[in-house]
Curated annotation (Swiss-Prot):
Tissue: Expressed in the intersomitic, the superficial proximomedial limb mesenchyme and the subectodermal mesenchyme.
Gene Ontology cellular component terms for the protein in this record: nucleus
Keywords noted in UniProt: Activator, Developmental protein, DNA-binding, Nucleus, Transcription, Transcription regulation
GO molecular function, one term: protein dimerization activity
Name of protein: Basic helix-loop-helix transcription factor scleraxis
Gene: SCX
Length: 187
C-alpha cells in the first residue's frame, strides 16, 4: 500500500472570490475588537447575481488614493523644506565657535534661546558691566538699580559654581585677542 503526502493548497487558489476587506470597508462594519481581519465574499462566488458590483467603486478609489497620497506627500515636502529653511536662517544669526560649526536642530533651538537671554542681559546691564560679561552680574545689580546695594555674601557666591554664558565667554575671548594684537602692534 502506498501513501501520498499532499500539501494543502493556498486559500486564494481554492477560493478566489474571498478577499480581505480594505480599511475603508472594514471601518464601515462593526469591529469585534479582535486582531483578525474580516473577509469579503463576492456574491458571484456562489453563482448569485448581485445588483451592484463593488469593483467599479473600488477601481475609482484606487485611482483617487494615489493622487491624494501624492498631494499629501508634496505638502509634507513643502512643510519640511520650509522648516529646514527657517532653521538655516536661524543658524546664520547665532554666533558659534568655530564659526562654521554645523548645529543640529535641537542645538540650534537651545543656542537661540540662550542667545536671546544673553541679548536681554546685555540690554538690561548695558555698558555698566566692565568685565564684558553682563550675564554674570550679581542679582543685586538688577534689584537695586545698578549695583548700588551691597554685594552678595561670599559664602553664597562660593557655594555654587559660577555659570558660564557661552556668548559672554566668546565676547571675552574676542576682546582679549584684540588687546593682545594691540599690545603686539605697540611693541
Amino acid at each position: 500500500m502506498s501513501f501520498a503526502m499532499l500539501r494543502p493548497a493556498a486559500g486564494r487558489y481554492l477560493y478566489p472570490e474571498i478577499s480581505m476587506l480594505s480599511e475603508d470597508e472594514e471601518n464601515g462594519s462593526e469591529s469585534s475588537g479582535s486582531d483578525e481581519k474580516p473577509f469579503h465574499l463576492d456574491a458571484d462566488g456562489f453563482g448569485i447575481k448581485a445588483g451592484k458590483r463593488r469593483s467599479g467603486k473600488k477601481a475609482g478609489r484606487l485611482h483617487r488614493e494615489p493622487r491624494q497620497r501624492h498631494t499629501a506627500n508634496a505638502r509634507e515636502r513643502d512643510r519640511t523644506n520650509s522648516v529646514n529653511t527657517a532653521f538655516t536662517a536661524l543658524r546664520t544669526l547665532i554666533p558659534t565657535e568655530p564659526a562654521d560649526r554645523k548645529l543640529s536642530k535641537i542645538e540650534t533651538l537651545r543656542l537661540a534661546s540662550s542667545y536671546i537671554s544673553h541679548l536681554g542681559n546685555v540690554l538690561l546691564v548695558g555698558e555698566a558691566c566692565g568685565d564684558g560679561q553682563p550675564c554674570h552680574t550679581s542679582p543685586a545689580f538688577f534689584h537695586h538699580g545698578g549695583g548700588g546695594g551691597s554685594p552678595p555674601p561670599r559664602d553664597s557666591e562660593n557655594s555654587q559654581p559660577k555659570q558660564i554664558c557661552t556668548f559672554c565667554l566668546s565676547n571675552q575671548r574676542k576682546l582679549s585677542k584684540d588687546r593682545d594684537r594691540k599690545t603686539a602692534i605697540r611693541s
